[in-house]
């Protein structure tokens, strides 16, 4: 496919020698990204740093490279390994309906016995329920950091929160492990307790991560806060300019209380496998995960003040 522009998105084909990349994430294993770029265009996206390595000069969210790779010849190589699909893209972008890269990847991982973790903001994943059930050890995680569709629309071009919640329920009801990834938690805006009560009966884990501001989007987010939430400016200044971690330390305590009050396990930086007792998902503290050294869930938190 030659370079084309569809609905304002620049799309082109790229060749890659190996679709599987050893992960440096605390959750360990391998990272797999069937696309370069992400058309959700989230204003807080840490993955925008990828532009440095791809040669793209277009704004993040306005380009998409469709990867082509040699077929995975020996899927058993990944037996027992965690394979994260969508660490710096979303495997279920709207364009996946046309290109089907993620479905092709899942088909190639048949028989691998890998632990597959899919990270998405889409409901297109329900298309692949048949494959997900066949693969066995699969987890599907949706990023949901608000129940306010207006705030969501300010931040990203992905499908509505309602559509994400509906997809989560369908996947959960199909017997597939699900995660509500409450991330990034925006100080003073994200109500993670309200989200917890919305999803507790349709997910196995609730995973919490703080908003990180770095690079070019730090100014954009702080400008947004000044414009839309001026009352929160002192809080954001304390956290993101003065590096005060007390706000999120308080949220950690709040999350632990929430877990105790609702008879939910509470863990630090782990991603335990298995299904939770219905209505009692595991709450995972992933705040300031850079404090955790090591990977493959063997790291230990080294708190900073």
Where are these regions (language model features)?
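Conserved Radical SAM active-site core
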Residues: 1-139, 147-151, 161-162, 173
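Auxiliary Fe-S-binding modules of radical SAM enzymes
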Residues: 2-15, 194-305
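Hydrophobic faces of well-ordered beta-strands that scaffold small-molecule active sites
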Residues: 30, 83, 116, 140-142, ...
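Generic structural signal for well-ordered alpha-helices
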Residues: 69, 103-106, 129, 164-168, ...
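Active-site beta-loop-alpha junctions enriched in small/polar residues
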Residues: 88-90, 121-123, 143-147, 183-185, ...
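Surface-exposed amphipathic alpha-helices with a cationic face
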Residues: 110, 133, 165-175, 256-262
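Glycine-enriched alpha-helix->loop->beta-strand junction motifs that scaffold or abut catalytic
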Residues: 134-140, 200-205
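Conserved strand-turn element in the central/C-terminal portion of the radical SAM core barrel
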Residues: 157, 169-190, 241-245
């Amino acid at each position: 496919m030659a370079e084309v522009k569809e609905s304002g998105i620049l799309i082109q084909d790229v060749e890659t020698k190996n679709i599987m990349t050893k992960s440096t994430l605390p959750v360990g294993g391998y990272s797999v990204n069937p696309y370069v770029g992400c058309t959700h265009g989230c204003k807080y996206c840490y993955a925008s740093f990828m532009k440095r390595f791809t040669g793209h000069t277009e704004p993040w969210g306005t380009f998409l490279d469709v990867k082509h790779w040699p077929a995975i010849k020996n899927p058993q190589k990944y037996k027992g390994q965690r394979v994260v699909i969508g660490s710096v893209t979303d495997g279920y972008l709207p364009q996946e309906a046309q290109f089907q890269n993620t479905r092709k990847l899942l088909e190639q991982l048949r028989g691998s016995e890998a632990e597959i973790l899919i990270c998405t903001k889409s409901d297109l994943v329900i298309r692949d329920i048949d494959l997900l059930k066949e693969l066995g050890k699969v987890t599907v995680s949706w990023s949901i950091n608000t129940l306010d569709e207006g705030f969501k629309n300010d931040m990203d071009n992905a499908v509505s929160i309602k559509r994400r919640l509906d997809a989560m329920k369908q996947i959960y009801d199909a017997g597939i492990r699900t995660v509500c990834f409450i991330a990034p938690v925006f100080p003073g805006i994200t109500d993670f307790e309200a989200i917890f009560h919305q999803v507790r009966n349709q997910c196995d884990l609730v995973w919490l991560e703080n908003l990180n501001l770095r690079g070019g989007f730090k100014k954009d987010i702080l400008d947004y806060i000044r414009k839309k939430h001026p009352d929160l400016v002192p809080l954001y200044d304390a956290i993101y300019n003065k590096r005060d971690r007390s706000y999120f330390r308080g949220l950690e305590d709040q999350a632990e209380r929430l877990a105790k009050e609702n008879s939910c396990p509470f863990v630090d930086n782990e991603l335990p496998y298995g299904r939770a007792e219905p209505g009692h998902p595991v709450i995972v503290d992933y705040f300031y995960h850079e404090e955790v050294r090591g990977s493959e869930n063997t790291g230990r938190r080294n708190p900073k003040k």
